C-alpha cells in the first residue's frame, strides 16, 4: 500500500466540439490502442446520426441515455464465515458514470449494425428511450441487489 495515500485523480479536459467532460470520457472508453482520432470520429458521426434521426440536440439525448443507464445499487461479494454473500451496496457517483459509459460502449460493440458509429448511435437512442441492452443491464443489476437485500446488514 502506498505511504503517501491515493494518487490524485486526473481531471479530463472538456471536449472541444461539445464542451463536455462526459463526451471526453465516452471517447476515452471508445478508444482502442490509443487511437483517439478514430474514437472521436466514430462518436461525432454517431452524434450526427442522432441529430438527423431525432431532431434533438445529441448531447441532451446522450445525457438522458446516461441517466437511464447509470445504476444506483450493485452487489459486491463478501466472505462471511466460509460462505460468500452478494451484498447490495450503493454505487459511488464516479463509478455510476464509469459503469454507464462502459455498458453503453460494450453493448454498442455487440450490436449488429454495420458501422460502429451506427451501433453507438442506436444504443444511445435506445438507452434514451429506456430500452436497449445497456438499460437491461442496469435493471438486471438492480434486480440482483433487490434479491440480495437480506444480506444488506453485511455492508462494510
From Swiss-Prot:
Signal peptide: none annotated. It comes from the Bacteria. The keyword tRNA-binding applies. Pfam families: Ribosomal_S7. One of its GO terms (cellular component) is small ribosomal subunit. Keywords: Ribonucleoprotein, Ribosomal protein, RNA-binding, rRNA-binding, tRNA-binding. Belongs to the universal ribosomal protein uS7 family. HAMAP family: Ribosomal_uS7_B. This is Small ribosomal subunit protein uS7.
